[in-house]
A protein has these predicted regions:
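Cell wall/extracellular polymer interaction/catalysis modules
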Residues: 2-21, 26-80
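Exported/periplasmic cell-wall-interacting domains
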Residues: 33-49, 78-87, 92-164
Length: 164
């Protein structure tokens, strides 16, 4: 509840500042609003955890309750290939993985549930209809996430992607 109030307050203050003509929102203020938005409830708050919000197509990384990266926009599974919700753990990492199933490069792959992985793609995150179940990120975000994770870190996938 505190997280929800903090998020609502941060968004309201930023909106009031812009609408009321108080001035522009600076980088620090915008960052605070972004971080507050990342506080939408990630069910897991113990240790380092990747939070994947399917409903909003966002990913961020937390240490406990503190957001240390993101949120960033991601692209998850399309209809028939939904990214499976649940609490998973990174079990295998491959910097230069190539899918044997789809014969496609999957840079910065971090597998968390059978063949589903966090990895980079070279297309916009808004490209429909979605992935084959993986959590796609930009090359920049995938490289940053790669540096922050190791085998054993939690991956909490929650919500539901519209249309799946």
């Amino acid at each position: 509840m505190k997280q929800l109030k903090a998020r609502v307050t941060a968004v309201a203050l930023a909106t009031a500042a812009l609408v009321g003509g108080v001035g522009t929102v600076g980088a620090g203020q915008a960052d605070a609003v972004t971080r507050a938005a990342a506080a939408s409830p990630c069910p897991t708050t113990i240790g380092r955890v990747v939070c994947v919000d399917l409903t909003h197509q966002k990913l961020w990384i937390q240490d406990g309750r503190k957001t240390i990266y993101g949120p960033v926009t991601v692209r998850t599974g399309r209809k028939g290939y939904a990214t499976r919700p649940g609490l998973w753990h990174v079990y295998w990492r491959d910097l230069h993985h190539v899918s044997s199933l789809y014969d496609v490069a999957m840079p910065y792959s971090q597998f968390f549930d059978k063949g589903q992985a966090l990895h980079a793609v070279d297309i916009p995150m808004s490209t429909p209809p979605g992935s084959h179940g993986c959590v796609n990120m930009t090359m920049h975000d995938a490289a940053a996430v790669w540096k922050l994770l190791k085998v054993g870190n939690a991956v909490d996938v929650f919500g539901r992607k519209p249309g799946t």
